[in-house]
Amino acid sequence: MFGNDVSRAAREHALSEWPRESCGVVSGGVYHPILNIAANPLNGFEIDARVWLDHAPEAVIHSHDASTVTGADGRPRPRHPHHPSRADMASQIAAGVPFGIVSTDGEAVSDVLWWGDHVLSEPLEGRTFLPGVRDCYALVRAWYFQRRGVMLADFARDDGWWSAGENMLVDGFAEAGFVPVDGPLQEGDVFFARAGSPVPSHSGVVLDGGLILHHHTGLSGCEPLGRWLHRITHWVRHAP
């Protein structure tokens, strides 16, 4: 998205700030390190509002601590995963510019993971699953953007939101411009389905020929609708 100099500078900044989260902005094609003013910089970042006036950021990059901890299941995991949190997503949606994450354990450091509305233009099939970036709802948004020229609302979300008492798809479909389907299905209709979850946690788009486009795990792609009928709980249609 930006040149190697931006990536290199952001990665070096992340290493120098670890275990605190680093943050910076890209302005004029150059990475500018910014002071993280969050109350708890080990677990989040905050940028002074004046930065937006001084730099007119084209993008924001921050770091995640990838050092190994023991999860609730007793297995090792990174302290913060290499994908955006709900707070990260909310900040990106509000800012309206691309955001990036670099993950480091203080020694190794990842490449920049970019996300934002530019992902809408990526190919619809063959996407690698990544929570909040390339997941089922992200694919629905991308299909509507590419095939209908419609920009659906995005929703900040944590991985596993469905197991935390939330019902994002059902609660949010009206805000995204959808209404319940009454009648035969049409191309572009969207389904909600339970995928081993107490509430609908998966969505996809109906295509012609009895197919659906969806992104459950692995790579996004098409498959026959019939394979998912027993899991589907809702059908909705976009109402321009």
Show where each model-derived region lies.
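Conserved beta-strand-loop surface patch within small alpha/beta domains used
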Residues: 1-58, 66-116
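Generic beta-sheet signal
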Residues: 100-102, 215, 238
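Extracytoplasmic and endomembrane cell-envelope/extracellular-matrix remodeling and assembly machinery
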Residues: 119-120
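Second-shell loop/turn segments in exported
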Residues: 124-130
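Active-site nucleophilic cysteine motif
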Residues: 130-147
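Short acidic alpha-helical/loop segments enriched in Asp/Glu that coordinate divalent cations
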Residues: 150-161
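...with weaker cross-activation on analogous glycine-rich loops/strands in unrelated enzymes
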Residues: 159-226
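Glycine- and charge-enriched low-complexity intrinsically disordered segments
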Residues: 224-240
